[in-house]
Amino acid sequence: MRKELKQIRLNAFTQCSICHHSKGQWKNPVDGSSLGYKEIDYWVNLAKKLEEGCFDALFLADVHGTYNVYKGSREAAVRHTVQFPSNDPTLAISAMAYATKHIGFACTYSTTYFHPYQTAKLFSTLDHLTQGRVAWNIVTSYLADANENFGLGDQMMEHDRRYDRADEYMEVTYQLWEHSWEEDAIVRDLEKDTHTDPTKVHEINYKGNYFNVPGPHMCEPSPQRTPVLYQAGGSSRGITFASRHAEGVFGMFPTIESCRKAVTAYRDAAVKQGRARDDMKIFPGVTVVVAETDMAAQKKAEEAKSYTSPEGSLALFCGWAGIDLAELDSTDNLVEMKTDAIQGLLSALVLIDADREWSLQDVADYMAIGSLMPKIIGSPSTVADELEKWIDETDCDGFNLVPVTQPSGFNDFVDLVVPELQKRKRMRTSYTGTTLRAVSYTHLRAHETRHD
């Protein structure tokens, strides 16, 4: 009996900014992000194209500070558009939802800088306006100057404590979304002159270590109540947080083997929380360059590399690492560094190529397209082969697609790769369900988002 093929699920990963993960592509004639990112038609057309390709969701990342670690300044980040300038991702969602019927919209929102009472209202509003197609990518944030700009001082709260606070933050939002309003609170009773039954709208009276929120929630129940919940933390504490709350996990795993280990770790953590192993859907990031032939795709990738801004790539890398490497010689071996601050990123580099010494120049070269994402370059058949290999050998559920150029990279994938995956019975050809949770998951409101 032939084993049923696992379906490949896709999210488009980008930011309301310029050349999200491939620094310098604003110079590439096929990239439209430099002018388009601030235009609503740009986002509406992208959403419609992704829906044509049966993507689960368009995922919009966000940051609230600048990458100012490299050379102790934000200058390189500003010069090379390292996630700067960056617009608010929540505001384009309503327009994109109006122009589409099925695709979901996920956006990053920080538990460090926004109060849970405000967050609950925002996502309920978006869930209403999208008719249940919104998701929240939960982050605790990591850029120090954002902390200063929000008036929280020049030192970030300690990493694990940020997650402790985020756990409590989630409890507040669950109570507001799930328990403040009864399902039949809206009565619209003309005879009694009553629109909403006040006996069915409740305070939550939450008192915790970080938050005291009496309630009630300001919004009537939305189609999903709780939005679909995504998370991207890869630390031990981040995995524990995801195992408690996330329905989807985004990750940057450089190799099939590292992805396999991460998938196992996430699924094991979910089981420890009393959840099924497949309750969380896991989406590694991947950068795809596709053309009609392998040779044409390689040529396209090489041309894209010619537009790269190495200093921009290093500003991004140092921001992630939290340590300034600019004073090193460009040929010094980073792997020999003993500092704890960068070990996670160095481990990722070793996984990519254990025989490489990984100088700053090597890092800049590798990050030229797709930053640290694994790269798949080739014809539709070659790309589909590799995506199938990742799915079958790692037990991941799909991918976060990170283009080199935008929107052309997404357009190429929808036009060339999606039909190949559909021909192989690896991708759906239409949507079922109405809400994002119903389309993408097996539950309407999962037990893990209900804290009864």
Q: Predicted segment positions?
A:
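Internal, glycine-rich beta/alpha segment that forms the wall or movable "lid"
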Residues: 6, 115-240, 244-245, 273, ...
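Hydrophobic faces of well-ordered beta-strands that scaffold small-molecule active sites
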Residues: 10-12, 58-60, 105-107, 134-138, ...
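Short, acidic/polar
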Residues: 39-48, 233-241, 380-390
